[in-house]
């Protein structure tokens, strides 16, 4: 398991953009997009790992991952 594995990964279809959008709420929004859901997920995982490395390189603390009830509460704020 990598440090990036702890973060939520969201892949959703965008009618406006006519493609899948991948994001990681704790680190960034709208990180990648494409027509193949699996490829977007794989790219999102790579971007998350790169972001984690950038945080470490810059000496910044990583944001806390959202999990369990926290995730549900955060998603309800958006809905």
Where do the protein language model's features map onto the residues?
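Short, charged, surface-exposed hinge/linker loops at domain edges
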Residues: 1-8, 38, 42-79
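ATP-dependent carboxylate activation and anion-phosphoryl transfer catalytic cores
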Residues: 2-5, 20, 28
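Residue-level detector of beta-strand structural context in well-folded domains
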Residues: 9-11, 30
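Generic helix-packing signal
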Residues: 26-28, 44
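A short, exposed loop/beta-hairpin motif centered on an aromatic-Gly-Thr core
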Residues: 28-39
């Amino acid at each position: 398991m990598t440090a990036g594995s702890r973060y939520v990964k969201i892949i959703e279809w965008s009618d406006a953009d006519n493609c899948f959008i991948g994001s990681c709420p704790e680190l960034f929004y709208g990180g990648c997009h494409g027509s193949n859901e699996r490829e977007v997920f794989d790219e999102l995982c790579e971007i998350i790992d790169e972001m984690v490395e950038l945080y470490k390189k810059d000496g910044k603390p990583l944001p806390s991952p959202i999990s369990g009830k926290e995730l549900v509460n955060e998603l309800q704020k958006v809905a």
